[in-house]
């Protein structure tokens, strides 16, 4: 079944923020800091305020007078000692703490006039010392971003697991293996840059925000907090969203400021960011350094795991910036039996753009760490890396399996995933292929990565299904598609639940006036949680419809059977169609006495457990030692996403996730220099993979239905990004093993590989 959205989007009829304009509209532009850390001595806006077409210029002084609050922080680790979440101002006042931080807002009749006026604002800065990288920020005497409030630049400390059990495991271990890995910072490269349009109705005193966001209802809540007003004063309207990947989850200053400016000036105010804005203001992802130690007995069984992670928060804690560093920890053992685990996470402030959730939100970081550590353990113990995994993998008969960090895996065939992947990629025949590559002066390697994700828990979703008199169904749901294909998926679920034609289902998202509640989209929960809520709503409709059908057919409702859109008296051929029943539902004469006309249903789903999508990624590569160039020859995904709703949508999600994972592993590096200047501020400098660099991806499906979900779904949105980095890096390290290289940090650029080969070769020559 093809995507319902595609015709609209491919023929230019999508509705993105920049497609919208309103009468008498004004345009906003933002002056951003050129310094990573500086005291703002003076701001002279006089020339800008008198420039042609300029209606207003606002600074932090104006924001303070208006009484607007800072950006809210939605998440802080709960079991940590009290951390410090600094005030994240809408406009920086006294000090700016990263390149790109907003300092002033210009409002003008045209975008060009706003940009020209912005350039005439004179700011006097007093540069301050910076702490940019994690090592620098943590070093003795490092400049502190928040003196007296976040000593040593530590925003929070979080610990989980059983340290005493780990100490015992390490004491009894025959082998100890350790590794240090860098999970490189990445910039979000969604095809649609951020944007927002603010409107205010003076009569109703309500404000409307058109924007690109993954979470309309949480955004409304944040606006209410900033303005210190009830949520009912705000409406969020979201059309099509051109990619999100997590960076459009949390709120940004521009969304609040255009809304405030619209109130102040009594006219709509529009701001559309460009790609340069995106690179230095969109929340970045990943960026952590982790040390891990694995204890094993003499046979190679895992005994204990000790993890010490340092995560880069940036200059502030964004809405969900503290989530990713701790989000992965409860499931750190993943597919393996590891009796004792302890994790320590330290969130650090640096003079960089804040980080936030990015596709996978911590799970890819943990999977990468563990799969690299296992490969290193196999090398150190001289054990086959497949057999080491097989020895420690959780068998099907152990499920449900409770991990030492409190999760309970309820389904999955982890070893079968591994076996099917090994067979399909011909792992046994690899050495002959390695020899063939060597005859051409190339180095060939093969790698794999097992994974389990935890998704879809802690999120309650409401759904309303509204049936019209002609039998058409409207789905009102509080998730928010940003490219996944929700219109198709929800229409398909509705069609299967109610027996209506797929084309007769309309899906409405992104309107907080029409949809009472919602959590937005993230964590691969939209289909597992949203679909389950739809099932509950459909059951309400079917129950009422059976009562109506019984009245129409002169039978008891308990004798009515529903199948494929028809209601039939059991054991007879007496039936009524969906369309006929829908029409009757709006005719009081044809309804049982006292029944309210209409055929709507509201459903809610409260998950009792996470879903656990799982699988195995396998990758085969070849590299040229003379240039360091790495080529991906084959890429295979064995996946278990529970019941598969739409294979095309699923494969699209995996394609995209793998592309992003390979991008991080081989190409992307959101890097800063020592002064805090961003050195990858355009696509000339920030290297996302081209289509020709993404391999053809092979798929094997091994589904086991999720027992915690009435429809059996597990969620698939982030799995590709989780499995790809370790699979590729493990393959590359395997290709480099002849040089004595047992680890190389991402991204695996040709320059980095070439330098490592050169260094290893020179070392051997000297010896």
Regions found by a protein language model. Name each.
Residues 1-155, 176-179, 254, 264, ...:
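Flexible, low-hydrophobicity surface segments
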Residues 93-95, 230-238, 263-274, 278:
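Conserved catalytic cysteine-centered active-site region
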Residues 166-227, 326, 445-469, 477, ...:
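Conserved beta-alpha junction segments in alpha/beta enzyme cores
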Residues 244-266, 270-272, 486-494:
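Thiamine diphosphate
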Residues 51, 61, 73, 81, ...:
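C-terminal catalytic domains of large/alpha subunits in multi-subunit enzymes
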Residues 5-8, 74-86, 152-196, 287-372, ...:
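Glycine-rich loop/linker segments at domain edges
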Residues 68-72, 117-120, 211, 220-222, ...:
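Short acidic, glycine/serine/threonine-rich loops at helix termini
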